[in-house]
Amino acid sequence: MILQKMPHYVDSILTQEDASAALQDGQVVVGLYTNRENVQSVVHSHPYYEMILPVAGSSVRYSVDGSVYDLHLGELILFPGEMYHSGKFNITDTTSERLVVQIAPGIWERAWAQSGLPRHVWSGDPVILDTDAVTQWDFRGLLERMAQTVYLDEKIRDTVQCCEVTELILLISQV
């Protein structure tokens, strides 16, 4: 299983200061997050885009600008950069496991330009994909492949990551 080859964070405590920092480990950062004891995040925003896919355990509840989104196993949410949000991780079970992808704004912009899509296609609100769309287009497989790009030669890593983010943008625009 590919999930074993990516960073795994258990009960990590996110601070507003940490969240607001730029990505430190590259332009596309993927990790598996497990929460057992730490059941809630602080309200935070970050300069990068963030995608979250619950893969085991509890549903997750996100609060965004006064709206509440319940994200069930197999559903995916995409937060644009600078969007304040918080998560509660123990809604339906005591443990939550989520695949989290963080995408730097620079590579997102290059991928968007490469996609050829007009800007009005996406309003900048959170995007939620239901389980059927996530399964049909194998978003989990795409996110797991994105995790593997850290092992690529630096000469091709940026190009592959940009192509994967472009694929992500194009697929989201179709669902």
Q: Which residues does each predicted region cover?
A:
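A ubiquitous short alpha-helical element
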Residues: 14, 123-134
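Intrinsic disorder/low-complexity segments
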Residues: 20-22, 32, 148
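N-terminal regulatory/effector-sensing and dimerization cores
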Residues: 24-122, 153-154, 158
